Amino acid sequence: MALQQTVEQTVAGLGYDLVEIERSAGGLLRVTIDLPWTAPTSEAVAAGIPEPFVTVEDCEKVTRQLQFALEVDGVDYKRLEVSSPGIDRPLRNEQDFERFVGEVIDITLKAPMGAAAAGQVSATRKKFRGTLERVAGADGAPGWQIVWSDAPEPKPGQKVSKKRAPAKLHALGFVLDELRDARLAPIVDFKGRKAKTQPGFSDIDDGTNVPD
């Protein structure tokens, strides 16, 4: 069985979502998992109930089961690392985009903007960062766009004049098939980013090492 299929079936069988698989030099196999997401109810939003998050115990459980499954399939690796998504979490499907509406994301297009840039940005540009928004597509189906400003952000503690003209906003609409990569922007402010998931981590290398 292929590595992707083995890992995906094992993770799903335990009730988790597979976010990403990475194989690094030195035999490291890194698996990122998350809890299945459902849109919060209006009552939960009003009450400020946070999303559940992956814990160290979740990562340990997946690690143990993956060890067994990978051994059965004869997968060659030296170290297995299972963790929750970081602040640069990849966005893979419509549900991920729905989940993170309002967040700042980084996207990379498969092809440069070309004539569609219309002089607003470089025609060769493929990478963009902006706030993710949901929009209605031409056929009425849900669509997506990011919105950003090229104006520099005020520095911490800097006073902004009330007479200052609003910064010009740019918007880029897209469909998922146009994207090579999409991730949450790894932004941390002085107060700390509002976490969508809390870090869980489990590392196996001739034993189990689980940092706090």
From Swiss-Prot:
GO terms for cellular component: cytosol. The keyword Cytoplasm applies. One of its GO terms (biological process) is translation. Belongs to the RimP family. It comes from Variovorax paradoxus (strain S110). The keyword Cytoplasm applies. Pfam families: RimP_N. Required for maturation of 30S ribosomal subunits. Signal peptide: none annotated. Disulfide bonds: none annotated. Gene3D superfamilies: RimP-like superfamily, N-terminal. It is found in: Cytoplasm. Its main location: cytoplasm. This is Ribosome maturation factor RimP. InterPro entries: Ribosome_maturation_RimP, RimP_C, RimP_C_sf, RimP_N, RimP_N_sf. Keywords: Cytoplasm, Ribosome biogenesis.
